[in-house]
Regions:
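Short, structured secondary-structure boundary patches
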Residues: 3, 58-66, 157-163
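Catalytic metal-binding/acid-base residues of hydrolase active sites
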Residues: 17, 45-46, 142-143
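Helix N-terminus capping/helix-initiation residues
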Residues: 23-24, 91, 139, 145
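Divalent-metal coordination cores built from histidine and acidic residues
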Residues: 26-134
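Active-site core of metal-dependent hydrolases
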Residues: 109-178
């Protein structure tokens, strides 16, 4: 019974890198919760680049008992490019156990569009592991179009937040991406 009560929806920040705030998760919560953000979906890409699975474990642990609901998309490209040596490498097998965590919603920002389009084994293993568990795959492929976009979408990438032109956004929407 909600008689005499007020229900107010909370804002869900659908894509952040929580560690980029440069504060611990509890401090981040203190900053955003009073302003209406009640949930976030974070990609711990930056901390994973440096600390690997220990960084992901830290973020999961530090957010477990917050009032702020913190959900995760697993970092898909660590390191971000094959030319980088940032401290860690995450392969499909390194991510598999995380999919059992109910706060892990899927695979974040598949930045390796060329590897996806060329069906590189390591990239496809990450996509398949996520898809086989019924989780979402988010994209990160600015400028991708035509046959390459078709291949990217066929690999299961459901979204792309990198569109900067209306025509690019429309093409991706027509292919079923959001």
């Amino acid at each position: 019974d909600l008689s005499g009560k007020i229900i107010c929806p909370g804002f869900i920040d659908g894509h952040i890198h929580l560690e980029s705030s440069m504060v611990r998760p509890a401090e981040f919560e203190r900053a955003v919760l009073p302003h209406g953000t009640t949930a976030v979906i974070t990609d711990p890409h930056e901390i994973a680049n440096v600390a690997g699975t220990e960084g992901i474990d830290y973020m999961l642990y530090e957010t477990e008992n917050l009032m702020l609901d913190v959900f995760f998309m697993l970092p898909s490209c660590v390191p971000a490019a094959d030319l980088e040596e940032s401290g860690a490498v995450l392969r499909a097998e390194d991510l598999r156990a995380y999919y059992e965590n109910p706060r892990v919603l899927g695979l974040a920002e598949m930045m390796n569009a060329p590897g996806t389009v060329k069906a590189e084994e390591g990239v496809l293993a990450k996509l398949k592991d996520c898809s086989d568990r019924g989780k979402r795959i988010d994209g990160h492929a600015p400028g991708l179009s035509g046959y390459q976009l078709n291949a990217y979408c066929a690999a299961g990438v459901a979204s792309d937040h990198e569109c900067s032109e209306v025509e690019e956004a429309l093409e991706k929407l027509r292919r079923g991406q959001w």
